[in-house]
Amino acid sequence: MATIDIFEKCSEINDLLDKGLIEDARSGVIKLLHLTKGQVSPYEELVNHLIREVGLYPYIISENASWEDAFAYEAFKVNTGEKESQTLHLAQSEVLTALLKGESLAVSAPTSFGKSFVIDAFIAIKEPQNVVIIVPTIALADETRRRLFRKFSDKYKIITTTGANLAQKNILILPQERAFAFIDSFDEIDIFIVDEFYKASTTFERENDRANSLLTVMARFGAKAKQRYYLAPNIHNLEPNVFTEGMRFMRMDFKTVVTMSRNEYKKKEEGESQDDFVARRLPELLEELKSKTLVYAGSYNKIDQVSDLLIGKLGISQSQLLNDFADWLRKNYSKKFRLADLAERGVGVHNGSLHRSLAQIQIKLFEETKGGIDTILSTSSIIEGVNTQAENVILLSNTNGSRSMFDYFTYRNIIGRAGRMFRYFVGRVFLFVKPPDKADTQLNLDFPDEVALSLDTEQPGVEFNKDQKDLQRKYHAEMEQLIGEEHYNNLKVLPIVQAASPSLFKELVETIVENPDWPLNHVALLRNNTYDWREPLSEVIPIFAGNNTRNVQIAVWRLSNNWIYPTPLIIAGLEQSKVSVDDFFSLERSISFNLATILALINAIRLELVEGSVDLTPFISRVSSAFLPKLAYQLEEYGLPRMLSKQLSQAGLFDFEDDTKEITDIVSEFQQKGYASILAAIPNHHPFDEYVLKHFFEGISRIEKHI
């Protein structure tokens, strides 16, 4: 950018400041930084001054700063757990200051705001005893664990799985379904954090049960918390509600990057179908961009369609890393795995169904500046599952899954993935469909009857109205009449019951009271002969699987050998039954969560109500870890694929079948053995195994801090 142009831009920004248009001035500064990135300018001092005026202190070029600018850069530095203090921007500092004063906050801020810096700084400065962080997905739980582990694992036990024992100081990072297991473990917690708390509203969460369980967790943990800190993007107003009562709502419309959009849909030719338009223009656009790009496809079917298009249109990458990855996928999953064909073309997939380690590996490859994945095809999982940012976002669809057109709030969340502090000052958005009309987002956290029924009568954590009290009394009376007061009191305190929908719980209780032998021949689930499982599972699986019951049943028989047989053999067996490699992932997820949860609830009810009932916990434990050893399954969340765990087990390095160990015990064993010795113990390892193992070790490594 020419020197004279820089001066003119600075003058324009200064005029905006004089008029009090601070947000416009901030956007102008960010655009200027984008245009001058990597350039040496005689106007650095002037640019620094403007950066300071708009509160973007981390962007100050400290080497050549005036004393005023240098002072601001240093004054806003805080301890975030890194080796050196980091500079916050003005809005981050405002939020952190309020938290350090003991306030409870509900904060709405853009995706690029840097909310994690505030959490890290609070922990580093305040050193709370117990921190509970609720996140919407397991993928986000591991991403958060990796960040906090490297900073704070020397002082805190970082917990992301159920069954873990608490230490003196703990940081729990959990999706709400796992949080129920720990509610009664605390009399008090120092700070309770909910990321993406808008998902407690059924307006924004597709699954009502998930919204209800999040509200229940917010009520239960919120009552035990000295402080609460709830986070969401793009909320304009928070309606008064019992779940955020006593919290200050802070709407921080503070941009650290600028988003610029282009209406690609206007290039659609007359008479051209949308599919033909995408087929013509998308490959062209990706070739033009040649930089990190998220493609929002909206649904699984659309991802399949776009995958086939790109496989046919894009050339094979010259990257050895990507070619190794593609070969690794074919070897460890299936030669027919479409992701392998995409990977060798520099394309990845994020759909919320893949093995967690596999999703992590793709995000890691996407973060590579050279030789990695440049494009990720995604559903809405990319906006709720991870914090990945890109330079470009391409919007191919304006629907969320198979539903009708999404709203402006969802649209803003998707395009908010464009741009990243320090790397992409300007995020570019390419619209293949017309976006929704601009609208302010009002967040209303209703208090559903199902949530009222799930809360404790004496200590609900939130205030009930008269109708809710009457409803709860009626429900309790019905349950006590059905099974007796003692049985009901024993059941309702169990975490598995507290996490369940009250209506589902009641329905299962009624079924078992009417037929104490239900599900028929359930004791057969403890046998090794999978044929014997057919009768009891045929009665349980339809409860959650509906029309997909057949495929779930087939998957259970095949997956029962998950630890015994190689994954390609499991997938080949499923393909013989017309179940695809892509379905393999979603079915395994459904079995390990939905089937395990329903069976655990049935088992708890039977053990309480049916005298002499057989405990099905051994089978439920196997199902909940997809028939892998529990530790091997949990290590996948940490980024270690089952294929490597199996090889390490066969080499005699680890005993993953020792159920007395916690995941933290195994992690300690990995740390003690070290990367080099573990890699050396894997005979004939694949070149990409090294990349995967390094990524895993990065997630269990600490920062060496200066004393």
Predicted regions and their residues:
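N-terminal helicase ATP-binding lobe
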Residues: 1-707
